């Protein structure tokens, strides 16, 4: 029974890998947008969104990133997918702008290997922004923390080039992977996204000691000129405590799940 399940898993993964190029051509990859809300004012305010890839497969149906991203990390297709996601996000932003929306910044995830790779992702990114006439301040690049194979000094050098080109940079899922606070301090990033795992253990009746690490991480980020986004927030008491700690933005199911483009657009204001 176990062997049958394992064999089926391997077969499915191989099919997904083999179907990648065809899926690109058939527009099977779509973006969902999870809002980021600022919590410093009297009322939560939409400040941006993270573009999250989904695969609508004719054979397997709706596939979340956990089903295919690890496969593409192995076979090199992730670098191609990164480019595709950026293009989809810019195309959607152009549609919103043309329709009269006050578009908010959209962040896209970029693998570390793409940042330092020889495929010149920076030139590609600038070309796509120019093609769709997207102001560079409407795209933020989120650097995934989960790849330890990239030399940190090399990564920092390339990130400085991206930043000098005008891109806003965020460290995604901070605390889930290989970055240290020391490395964070030396990276030219504008935003720190605190991983969901920090907040999973929070309880309404917990002591301040149980959350003091987050308090001081937010302060450290602010002291070095960065903004902070808390990810995976689902409860009101979490929002209240993060507001008390001066966190800038919240991303999570408390405010909204990831939304199709049409639903997300309804949360943006139209230009007068």
Question: PLM features: what roles do these ranges have?
Answer:
Residues 2-71, 109, 171, 251, ...:
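Active-site core of bacterial EAL-family cyclic-dinucleotide phosphodiesterase domains
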Residues 3, 9, 38-50, 56, ...:
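Catalytic core of bacterial c-di-GMP phosphodiesterases, primarily the EAL and HD-GYP domains
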Residues 8, 56-59, 111-116, 138-152, ...:
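EAL-family c-di-GMP phosphodiesterase catalytic domain
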Residues 12, 16, 64, 121, ...:
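Helical mechanochemical/support elements of P-loop NTPase systems and associated helical scaffolds
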Residues 16, 78-82, 210:
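Hydrophobic (often cysteine-bearing) scaffold residues that line and stabilize catalytic clefts
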Residues 16-19, 51, 67, 71-72, ...:
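Structural preference for long, well-ordered alpha-helical segments in enzyme cores
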Residues 69-70, 79, 156, 160, ...:
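Conserved long alpha-helical elements within nucleotide-processing catalytic cores of c-di-GMP signaling
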């Amino acid at each position: 029974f176990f062997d049958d399940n394992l064999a089926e898993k391997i077969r499915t993964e191989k099919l997904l890998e083999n179907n990648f190029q065809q899926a690109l051509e058939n527009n099977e990859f779509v973006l969902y947008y999870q809002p980021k809300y600022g919590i410093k004012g009297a009322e939560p305010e939409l400040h941006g969104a993270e573009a999250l890839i989904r695969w609508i497969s004719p054979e397997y149906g709706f596939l979340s990133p956990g089903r295919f991203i690890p496969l593409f990390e192995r076979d090199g297709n992730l670098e191609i997918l990164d480019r595709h996601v950026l293009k989809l996000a810019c195309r959607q932003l152009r549609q919103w702008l043309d329709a009269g929306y006050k578009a908010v910044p959209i962040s896209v995830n970029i693998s570390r290997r793409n940042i330092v790779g020889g495929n010149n992702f920076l030139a590609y990114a600038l070309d796509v922004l120019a093609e769709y006439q997207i102001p560079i301040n409407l795209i933020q690049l989120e650097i995934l923390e989960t790849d330890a194979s990239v030399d940190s000094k090399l990564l920092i050098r390339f990130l400085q080039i991206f930043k000098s080109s005008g891109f806003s940079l965020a460290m995604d899922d901070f605390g889930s992977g290989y970055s240290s606070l020391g490395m964070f301090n030396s990276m030219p990033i504008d935003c720190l996204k605190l991983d969901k795992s920090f907040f999973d253990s929070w309880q309404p009746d917990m002591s301040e000691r149980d959350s003091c690490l987050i308090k001081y991480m937010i302060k450290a980020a602010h002291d070095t000129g960065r903004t902070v986004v808390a990810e995976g927030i689902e409860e009101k008491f979490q929002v209240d405590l993060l507001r008390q700690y001066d966190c800038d933005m919240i991303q999570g199911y408390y405010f909204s799940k990831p939304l199709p483009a049409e639903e997300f657009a309804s949360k943006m204001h139209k230009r007068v």
